[in-house]
């Protein structure tokens, strides 16, 4: 299962299509990767 927007992740492949794993301090979450 992939992680949806703002879901926790450790790498880009954890996230659903068009989402990438972002690191903000100690928090890692899936955010839009800019693709359609």
UniProtKB/Swiss-Prot annotation:
| Keywords, alphabetical | Amidation, Disulfide bond, Ion channel impairing toxin, Knottin, Neurotoxin, Secreted, Toxin, Voltage-gated sodium channel impairing toxin
Cysteines paired by S-S bonds: 2-16, 9-21, 15-30
Where is it mostly found?
secreted
Q: Where in the cell is it found?
A: Secreted
Describe tissue expression. Expressed by the venom gland.
**Top-level taxon:** Eukaryota
The record lists the effect of residue 24 to K as: Loss of activity on Nav1.8/SCN10A sodium channel
Further comment found in the protein's record: Negative results: has no inhibitory activity on the late current size of Kv2.1/KCNB1 potassium channel but does slow its kinetics of activation. Also shows minimal activity at TRPV1.
Entry text on domains: The presence of a 'disulfide through disulfide knot' structurally defines this protein as a knottin.
> What role is this protein assigned?
Neurotoxin that selectively increases Nav1.8/SCN10A peak current (EC(50)=894 nM) and causes a large hyperpolarising shift in both the voltage-dependence of activation and steady-state fast inactivation. Acts by binding to the domain II S3-S4 extracellular loop of the channel. In vivo, causes spontaneous pain behaviors (that gradually subsides over 30 minutes) when intraplantarly injected into mice.
Provide the protein name: Beta-theraphotoxin-Eo1a
């Amino acid at each position: 299962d992939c992680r949806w927007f703002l879901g926790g992740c450790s790498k880009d492949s954890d996230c659903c299509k068009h989402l990438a794993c972002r690191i903000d301090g100690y928090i890692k979450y899936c955010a839009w990767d800019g693709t359609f």
